[in-house]
Amino acid sequence: MDIDISTLPTPSYLVDQRLLIKNLELLASVKERTGCKILLAQKAFSMFSVYPLIAKYLDGVTSSGVMEARLGYEEMGKEVHTYAPAFADHEMDDVIRYSDHIVFNSFHQWNKFKDKVKSSGKQIECGLRLNPKYSEIDTDIYNPCFTGSRLGITPEQFQPDQLDGIDGLHFHTMCVQNSDTLERTLKVVDDTFGSYIKQMKWLNFGGGHHITRSDYDIETLIRCIQFAQDTYGVQVYLEPGEAVALNTGYLVSTVLDTIENGMHLAILDTSAACHMPDVLEMPYRPHIIGAGVPNEKAYTYRLGGPTCLAGDIIGDYSFDVPLKEGDKLIFCDMAHYTMVKNNTFNGMNLPSIAFYSQENGLQIIKQFGYEDFKSRLS
């Protein structure tokens, strides 16, 4: 990394504008080649200070409820698509206020709210989420098609006679996968729901497309989009979240102490449980600049956070020299599913949020403190 972080407080999330633009340009090229529309999935990345930049390349946002819908409406000002497994009565007025596309999870919810949507005076397009009962995701916590899933309408539950007023259909069955998975999934969707898609204005491929990953097959994605457009005559939407922010950000941490207990241990000011929860949830081991796998380099350490959770362990890493108090460690690919999922368990402060651009250098966008911790409690 070529950014001087010597003055950066830790822990801090740091997003590099140059890397973000690189991803956005690639996504924009898919739009230009196909005519599809691409939305930012805010559930993965909601750093709204960069929404004006993202708006130059993408068509809007997709939201998982009224809070995200309002954020996208106020901060990006383009298309706002909103989906939730169920909408509550008291929030529907705001969902309508901030959305121009609403996707319902069941025919019951559609029938419950369709009159309210129609009488709102807004030009809102409505859709239904499909569950084609096909997915190639191995981790059930991220698999919307596992047995007993609450997400989407299965072929057995589909009611063709209830489609009046429905403008589009939506499926989201992928998680950080390549376009060959999409190609196979689209075949199942076509076989199962194709006759209904032909009645629609749009088809939303959902998210989970790892489009900006170095080995992603763009040409297969292009073919899938063109197949849907040619076969059904629909506008195709994609909703990447992680792909927008993939490899654009870092989490900068400081070593607080080193101890021994049968192995070298280092305690950081950064918590897996609080600041990068997917490390424990997935689980996975994030890359650190200059570090190796255990025993690859001369000194191996287990890195842990400062909370009282015994399992607040980031992972085992090796280094060329011994770690010492004050050393800074830089975790890679920390822009997505971090800021949106972090928490203040144990009274942990939230990491600062920083942004680097060639025009303005390194800027601290936001810092947090006691009032942020206290304001969530009562």
Outline where the language-model segments fall.
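Short, well-ordered secondary-structure micro-motifs
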Residues: 51, 137-140, 179-181, 213-216, ...
